[in-house]
């Protein structure tokens, strides 16, 4: 695999050189137009935007006219014939094709406009830098903006644009002009590719180029950032450049969800926002009950900042809108926590005992017995600190490896000897934990149930039940009891499994923090707390139980989607990052996004030293402390220390405090001081300790004095699983040709070294006669670490790819149901629902069964005669028209009742006592609608139909999501039957969706046929 990657990298670099040559040709055209634009007046420069828009409109006019003509042909009425239904389908297909042609035509004209449009943006930036004020003739947008923007003022038909404005409370004087490399980056973004630009190369300014160009179509450009601060900052910082040209700019994170102002933000030409908010707005839009409440426009073009963080690091976690289930705190966590904790402590006690024994055995020369006991400790708790330290000592790692190799022979045939004394076994590479037979027996005894882990064969019990000579009602009661018991037991087993995960795989101050009696997740990529996010599948509740904090109510997902599937819905997608090259293969295969590495504006002079490897963590940390003291005290340089967890950042800080070295700590606990800490981080002699800085958008400024001293020094305390995160840390120094340095300190006890067997380097240290405090460095170490990181990246890619296969199934279902729901918002779907139901009815069954099925759905007898049924000809067509007829009779009956209520209401209004009876009723929803739209009784009935359909879509969809999650979980067991779980999942998911959609249609129609206006109203 690594050999294949080397070939891919070779061709990628070759291709990149060709891409850069092509970009330089376009760059020359931009510079040609820049020469012309210098001669333009301010008004002439501004009028170029209107000229561009006219050209786009002229090119697409005929296509839009054709589209509008087809839209007029669509048939929207309460009753629609089957022929009209098919006609609508053909028209909609043709409209979709025209929309695609419009997009292609717009892309074609935008590509033609690109050199001149980019030149306009650069010339605008230049004029803002070189002039304190730019005076132009006022237009309509100027008048609107003058009410809320301090940087422009109106005087006698003229607008004065100042080059001074504020963002995030800071005042700035515009001083930026696009470099040539930034223009190249802008071209790549417009092409729908990823521009890899090193940290400090001005990606925020680069984005203004494709933003301006693509906003000319009027369809909206979304600029996606990884956090709220960046979304607000960038929108305020860059807005005047676009607003000067008549484009509107806004940020969704400034406003509350579902608000009028957020809707207006989406109507802007350019909309900034965080990835999560864009996704949640999409999900919320598919839960509204009126078109007036829709927030987002059609997804057109998105530019994602830190695209690798959004589409790769966060791709595995779906975003979920859920509702708390009242009173549904899972009591099993309280019931089972103490039992799992007891089991965990028993194993810890046992491992401590046999570890001491194994150490004595190995020291005395009994390597066989000592190796077996050492391997037991490794299988039972691989992160056990005394074990890690012992393995770093002479020959001990070799003893463990030899023992492991022996027991893994013949497909782990003898592994039961090792595991027989353990309660659970941890696989650190796969990050999994499983109960051993001893652990299963322990929990079963604690629960006083020898079959605790065995689920009953419910299918067999149902068969046995049918043979019993009892009434149908009794059978139904027993059946419900069996189902309830089955799910209760299944839930207890699941709870035990989640609790053991919480105790063995998740660590406080690494994976999560406990703040204000709540468990808060720490983002491993950024070191930030992820607010309002919880681990799924009961794991978060297990952690709450473990930490003895309040266990929050369980919740039911109402809507869910992954970032991957949301962003793939945009017509065009592009992104920027300083670290995309390492994930090139994934971007191509999953998103069809090419990566182009943009050259730096100035040569990089940063010194990147080889990694330094120590035997133990203690030796490593001592060396790090000494290096920090030397750099900050002797060389007076600012030092940024990058750590992988809150725990390590606090350890380094305490060690420095003991030596009276002042330091600032930036982690999930101190994130509120972030702005101050970053501002201080570039000053002479300042030491800053931070958890992973990837994706933070931090710009550590250094003075000319610090540049002379050697610039910002980066010290890494450990290599991350991903090379990208390491590169993000390194990228904090050496920006725009500034001096700087980076150095990583490692030990054989680090997770990366242990899990991937790199701690076997200890044998090399032994052969070299390594002494305490000495270290290894050089190409061998760096290459070995890079290979290990590549293995992890490949493994993570495989996991994400597999997860995407699963999510693609429900994604197709989601797209279908959301389209169906959007139609339900806009048109009357009753005829379509009747058609869907009739189409699914089996006309090949016996007449009695056929008639019973019809009655169960429509509650109407004698819909089809026996003779008509026998003929079979056009039976479904006849059925469709007959049901529609009854449906309209039903509507007219309701309508006549409402007419009676209307006249009655006039009388009620004269008498307050009688009016109170009218207002409070079972059918309060109908009355509320009626009071709003009393003059349009047909609209009341149509609204009732719409609300019924939308209610059942939402209600049944959330149940379907839950069922799909269960199916995903249980399909994994098919691997024991030598079957591919994904194939089983796809087959069953198809059946599950068909049943869901059939029931949705059936329930909607049945409800309308049976609902009544309460007689108490009359």
UniProtKB/Swiss-Prot annotation:
Q: Which InterPro entries match?
A: Helicase_ATP-bd, Helicase_C-like, P-loop_NTPase, SecA, SecA_DEAD, SecA_motor_DEAD, SecA_preprotein_X-link_dom, SecA_SF2_C
Q: What is its EC number?
A: 7.4.2.8
Where does it live in the cell? Cell inner membrane; Cytoplasm
> What membrane topology is given?
Peripheral membrane protein
Q: Which Pfam families match?
A: P-loop_SecA (PF21090), SecA_DEAD (PF07517), SecA_PP_bind (PF01043), SecA_SW (PF07516)
Its top-level enzyme class, in one word, is translocase
Annotated GO molecular function terms are: ATP binding; protein-exporting ATPase activity
Q: Which reaction does it catalyse?
A: ATP + H2O + cellular proteinSide 1 = ADP + phosphate + cellular proteinSide 2
* Family label: Belongs to the SecA family.
| Protein name (database record) | Protein translocase subunit SecA
The source organism is: Karelsulcia muelleri (strain GWSS) (Sulcia muelleri)
Q: Which gene encodes it?
A: secA
């Amino acid at each position: 695999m690594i050999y294949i990657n080397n070939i891919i990298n070779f061709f990628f670099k070759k291709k990149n050189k060709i891409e850069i040559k092509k970009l330089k040709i376009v760059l020359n055209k931009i510079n040609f137009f820049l020469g012309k634009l210098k001669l333009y007046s301010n008004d002439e420069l501004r009028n170029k935007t209107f000229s561009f828009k006219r050209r786009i409109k002229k090119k697409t006019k005929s296509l839009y006219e054709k589209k509008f003509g087809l839209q007029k042909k669509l048939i929207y009425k309460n009753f629609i014939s089957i022929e009209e239904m098919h006609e609508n389908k053909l028209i909609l297909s043709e409209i979709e094709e025209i929309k695609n042609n419009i997009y292609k035509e717009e892309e074609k004209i935008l590509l033609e406009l690109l050199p001149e449009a980019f030149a306009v943006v650069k010339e605008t930036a230049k004029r803002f830098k070189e002039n304190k004020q730019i005076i132009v003739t006022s237009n309509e947008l100027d008048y609107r903006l003058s009410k809320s923007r301090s940087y422009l003022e109106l005087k006698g038909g003229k607008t004065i644009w100042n080059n001074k404005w504020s963002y995030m409370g800071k005042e700035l004087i515009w001083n930026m002009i696009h470099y040539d490399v930034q223009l190249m980056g802008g071209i790549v973004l417009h092409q729908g590719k990823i521009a890899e630009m090193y940290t400090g190369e001005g990606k925020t300014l680069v984005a203004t180029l494709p933003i301006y160009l693509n906003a000319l179509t009027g369809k909206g450009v979304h600029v996606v950032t990884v956090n709220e601060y960046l979304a607000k900052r960038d929108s305020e910082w860059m807005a005047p450049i676009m607003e000067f040209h008549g484009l509107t700019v806004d940020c969704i994170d400034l406003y509350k969800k579902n608000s009028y102002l957020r809707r207006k933000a989406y109507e802007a030409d350019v909309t900034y926002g965080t990835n999560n908010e864009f996704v949640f707005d999409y999900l919320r839009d598919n839960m509204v009950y009126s078109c007036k409440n829709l927030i987002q426009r059609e997804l057109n073009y998105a530019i994602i900042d830190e695209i690798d963080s959004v589409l790769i690091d966060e791709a595995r976690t779906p975003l979920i809108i859920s509702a708390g289930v009242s009173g549904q705190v899972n009591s099993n966590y309280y019931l089972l926590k103490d039992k799992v904790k007891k089991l965990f402590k028993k194993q810890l006690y046992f491992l401590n005992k046999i570890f001491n024994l194994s150490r004595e055995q190995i020291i005395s020369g009994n390597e066989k017995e000592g190796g077996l006991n050492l391997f037991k400790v490794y299988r039972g708790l691989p992160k056990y600190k005394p074990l890690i330290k012992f393995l770093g000592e002479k020959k001990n790692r070799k003893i463990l490896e030899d023992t492991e190799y022996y027991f893994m022979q013949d497909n782990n045939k003898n592994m039961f000897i090792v595991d027989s004394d353990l309660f659970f076994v941890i696989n650190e590479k796969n990050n999994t934990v499983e109960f051993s037979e001893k652990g299963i027996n322990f929990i079963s005894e604690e629960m006083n149930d020898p079959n605790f882990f065995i689920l009953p064969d419910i299918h067999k019990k149902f068969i046995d039940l049918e043979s019993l000579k009892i009434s149908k009602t009794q059978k139904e009661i027993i059946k419900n009891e069996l189902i309830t018991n089955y799910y209760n037991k299944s839930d207890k087993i699941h709870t035990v499994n989640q609790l053991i995960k919480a105790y063995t795989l998740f660590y406080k101050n690494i994976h999560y923090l406990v703040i204000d009696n709540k468990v808060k997740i720490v983002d491993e990529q950024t070191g930030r707390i992820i607010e309002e996010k919880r681990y799924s599948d009961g794991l978060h509740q297990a952690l709450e139980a473990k930490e003895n904090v309040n266990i929050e109510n369980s919740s039911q997902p109402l809507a869910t989607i992954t970032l991957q599937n949301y962003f793939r819905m945009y017509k065009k997608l592009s992104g920027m990052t300083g670290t995309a090259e390492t994930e090139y293969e994934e971007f191509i295969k999953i998103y069809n996004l090419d990566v182009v590495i943009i050259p730096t504006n100035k040569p990089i002079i940063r010194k990147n030293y080889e990694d330094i490897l120590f035997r133990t963590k203690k030796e490593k940390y001592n060396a790090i402390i000494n290096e920090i003291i030397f750099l900050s005290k002797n060389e007076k340089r600012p030092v940024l220390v990058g750590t992988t967890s809150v725990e390590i950042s606090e350890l380094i800080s305490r060690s420095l405090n003991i030596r009276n070295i002042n330091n600032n700590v930036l982690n999930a606990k101190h994130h509120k001081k972030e702005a101050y800490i970053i501002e201080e981080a570039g000053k002479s002699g300042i030491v800053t300790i931070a958890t992973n800085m990837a994706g933070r958008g931090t710009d550590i400024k250094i003075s000319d004095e610090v540049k002379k001293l050697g610039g910002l020094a980066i010290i890494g305390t450990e290599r991350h699983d991903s090379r990208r995160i390491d590169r993000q840390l390194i990228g904090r120094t050496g920006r725009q040709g500034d001096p700087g340095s980076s150095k990583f300190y490692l030990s054989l006890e680090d997770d990366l070294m242990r899990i991937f067997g790199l701690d076997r380097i200890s044998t090399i240290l032994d052969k070299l006669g390594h002494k305490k405090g000495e270290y290894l460095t050089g190409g061998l170490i760096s290459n070995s670490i890079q290979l290990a990181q590549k293995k992890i990246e490949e493994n993570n890619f495989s996991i994400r790819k597999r997860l995407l296969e699963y999510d693609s199934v429900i994604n197709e279902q989601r797209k279908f149901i959301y389209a169906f729901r959007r139609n339900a918002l806009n048109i009357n779907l009753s005829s379509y629902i009747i058609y869907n139901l009739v189409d699914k009815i089996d006309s090949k069954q016996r007449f009695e069964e056929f008639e019973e099925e019809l009655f169960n759905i429509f509650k109407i007898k004698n819909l089809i005669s026996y003779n008509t049924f026998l003929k079979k000809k056009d039976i479904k067509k006849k059925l469709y028209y007959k049901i529609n007829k009854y449906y309209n009779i039903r509507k007219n009956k309701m309508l006549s009742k409402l007419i009676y209520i209307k006249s009655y209401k006039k009388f009620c209004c004269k008498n307050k006592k009688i009016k109170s009876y009218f207002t409070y009723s079972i059918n309060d929803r109908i009355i509320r609608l009626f009071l709003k739209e009393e003059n349009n009784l047909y609209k009341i009935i149509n609204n009732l139909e719409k609300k019924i359909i939308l209610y059942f879509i939402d209600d049944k969809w959330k149940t379907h999501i839950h069922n799909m999650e269960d199916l995903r979980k249980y399909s994994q067991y098919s691997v024991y039957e030598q079957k591919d779980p994904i194939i089983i999942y796809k087959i069953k998911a198809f059946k599950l969706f068909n049943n869901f959609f059939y029931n949705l249609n059936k329930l909607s129609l049945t409800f309308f046929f049976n609902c009544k206006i309460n007689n108490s109203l009359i």
